[in-house]
Amino acid sequence: MSNPNYTSANGTSLSQYEVWFLTGSQHLYGEDVLKQVAAQSQEIADALNGSSDVPVKVVWKPVLTDSDAIRRTALEANADDSVIGVTAWMHTFSPAKMWIQGLDLLRKPLLHLHTQANVELPWADIDFDFMNLNQAAHGDREFGYIQSRLGIPRKTVVGHVSNPEVTRQVGVWQRASAGWAAVRTLKLTRFGDNMRNVAVTEGDKTEAELRFGVSVNTWSVNELADAVHGAAESDVDALVAEYERLYEVVPELKAGGARHESLRYSARIELGLRSFLEANGSAAFTTSFEDLGELRQLPGMAVQRLMADGYGFGAEGDWKTAILVRAAKVMGSGLPGGASLMEDYTYHLAPGQEKILGAHMLEVCPSLTATKPRVEIHPLGIGGKEDPVRMVFDTDAGPGVVVALSDMRDRFRLVANAVDVVDLDEPLPNLPVARALWSPKPDFATSAAAWLTAGAAHHTVLSTQVGMDVFEDFAEIAKTELLTIDEGTTIRQFKKELNWNAAYYRLAGGL
């Protein structure tokens, strides 16, 4: 449940973005043909814009017929921060040597749409004028060759734009491209360092800035504490009233309750944290229970609410997971469900009914439920601070994906597992944290063995908004290894893929 009255500069709306639609042809066919190419390619762009599957505005560009125009268009796309990618279609034959400079310079994600204007052949009327005009079957093969020759990462979507599967795939790629755009400009604020002696939350922040674009920097938690303790009483009053309006607040935390001051302090944390992140221009952050300085509580509900408003978050200094949470928030914008930091905590191992119970100390995003969370206060046995306030809820049932990002020394590795989030078998009256229960695909034993074999992290992002296909496109755009665990996974094949990937990425990195 995101705060409906708060508008953040780090918003997740896809309306700020656009994708350029590029059509390839050549002057060989004459001006009349080029006019038809322009008209029909505009119709294709309009059809994409008319589909509810396509979340980002498609902007048609004039037909490209020579290398200079292609090169200039690529450079213009690179320079425009609102452009998150380009879609290319060769309506006629467009000699691919014209595309070499432009493709070599292009730094935005590329989708190759292999389509044509007509659905059916006009059997009785077809002549060679029709063949010259409608030869994407010919032109796109030339374009595919030069992309492969140059080693250009791209997604290829095949079919007529009236086919819902075509628009669905275009939309998936657009969402992945939006996530990439968000990461490329992401500023991430760390309060304190990583949890001591933990391995997987470490990583090369300089390499991450090179590979992903994200800028990861650290501030003293006492600078945050100063912002928290400087929150105005009137702002605290307003925010506490909002809590009582939006959530089911337990009586002891309400005005007049024995622990109302703890709720007010949680509101101070939220106000200070928001103001600090806004001043930094940060859309993601981390905290650590081992480094709380002058803060009286480990940030709990404040973190949950900031995640609900689109911020990325990682616990215990885990900046890599904060990146994933931010990307997932943007990629899932406008879709039902949510995305959150998650951690595999414990198992239900009844034979044939195995499940994973995921949670964290406090920080699970309420976007994972459509129900009204309950605001509670309970002791926290680590951190040495006052009892923290948190929202408690069960994640809604439905399909999802859990994704981890690990630093493997010579590269970053994404690992994604398709899951089914399920209802709790029984209530959990003594577990005072938000949680999710899921059945991993293809089954528990294969999933866990593959996850461990891959060296995947114990912190993840759980998304119930987007599926595996969005993360596959994201990894392709990011040129980052992705290992998928789903219905088709076997350990034998998974181990082979790990070995192949080790050879491929080491060779590719050295070329």
Curated annotation (Swiss-Prot):
CDD domains: L-arabinose_isomerase. One of its GO terms (cellular component) is cytosol. The gene is araA. It catalyses: beta-L-arabinopyranose = L-ribulose. SUPFAM superfamilies: FucI/AraA C-terminal domain-like, FucI/AraA N-terminal and middle domains. The keyword Manganese applies. Its cofactor is Mn(2+). It is an enzyme of class 5 (isomerase). Binds 1 Mn(2+) ion per subunit. GO terms for molecular function: L-arabinose isomerase activity; manganese ion binding. Keywords: Arabinose catabolism, Carbohydrate metabolism, Isomerase, Manganese, Metal-binding. NCBIfam families: PRK02929.1 (NF002795). The lineage of its organism: Bacteria, Bacillati, Actinomycetota, Actinomycetes, Micrococcales. Belongs to the arabinose isomerase family. GO terms for biological process: L-arabinose catabolic process to xylulose 5-phosphate. PANTHER family: L-ARABINOSE ISOMERASE. HAMAP family: Arabinose_Isome. Its EC number is 5.3.1.4. Catalyzes the conversion of L-arabinose to L-ribulose. This is L-arabinose isomerase. Mn(2+) binds at E316, E343, H360, H459. Pathway: Carbohydrate degradation; L-arabinose degradation via L-ribulose; D-xylulose 5-phosphate from L-arabinose (bacterial route): step 1/3.
